């Protein structure tokens, strides 16, 4: 059994009383694993900061465009709390995201975490992602993903046409991985009780675990 796993188990045991506790104050962090995201990273940071995210941890995996410049800009502004420059050429997404979660939890004392991609916008109907976090006694929130139809003449954050899922995509000769397929939900989770994130950030292992569907949507 690895030292990290032993440490996680120790934390889970000590945090048991906090597993489902409602709190009046929430520190919300977002992790981002990026590579060559100059076309969307800045808008992503600005959008989620306005939605209530308190801090970002970013892993940059060998970007060769202006992504590092954008990261430095928002590190200097204090929005990005830590940057990990990952030089590996294999894609260990689950391990790299887990590393960011662990830092957010143990170093920056985050209460809740969103593990996002640079091309995702996590939207709360109330205008603040924290509103639902204050009220829930769950420790995992399942968030519906909604595909957005690309519009060449607009930047991605201005696309406003959502795609309705097709129930029988093979009937229309559509790929099972197309925009028209129903997307798997993604999760927001507490740090208390955290054990492991899944590949793609669609599931998380917690102990104990109590999940609930969320009004937050991912576009």
Regions found by a protein language model. Give the residues of each.
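Short beta-strand/loop segment that forms part of the nucleotide-sugar
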Residues: 54-62, 83-86
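Short, acidic, metal-binding catalytic loop of nucleotide-sugar glycosyltransferases
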Residues: 46-55
């Amino acid at each position: 059994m690895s030292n990290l796993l032993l440490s996680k188990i120790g934390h889970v045991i000590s945090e048991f009383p906090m597993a489902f506790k409602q709190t009046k104050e929430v520190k919300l962090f977002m992790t981002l694993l990026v590579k060559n995201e100059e076309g969307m990273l800045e808008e992503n940071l600005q959008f989620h900061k306005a939605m209530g995210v308190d801090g970002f941890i970013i892993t940059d995996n060998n970007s060769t465009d202006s992504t590092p410049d954008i990261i430095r800009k928002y590190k200097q502004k204090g929005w990005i709390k830590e940057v990990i420059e990952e030089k590996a050429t294999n894609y260990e997404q689950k391990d790299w995201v887990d590393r960011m979660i662990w830092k957010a939890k143990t170093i920056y004392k985050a209460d809740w975490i969103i593990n996002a991609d640079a091309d995702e916008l996590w939207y709360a109907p109330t205008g603040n992602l924290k509103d639902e976090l204050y009220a829930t006694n769950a420790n995992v929130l399942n968030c519906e993903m909604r595909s957005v139809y690309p519009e060449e003449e607009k930047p991605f954050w201005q696309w406003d046409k959502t795609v309705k899922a097709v129930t029988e995509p093979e009937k229309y000769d559509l790929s099972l991985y197309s925009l028209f397929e129903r997307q798997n939900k993604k999760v927001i989770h507490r740090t208390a009780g955290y054990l492991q994130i899944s590949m793609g950030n669609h599931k998380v292992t917690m102990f104990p675990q109590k999940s609930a569907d969320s009004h937050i949507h991912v576009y």
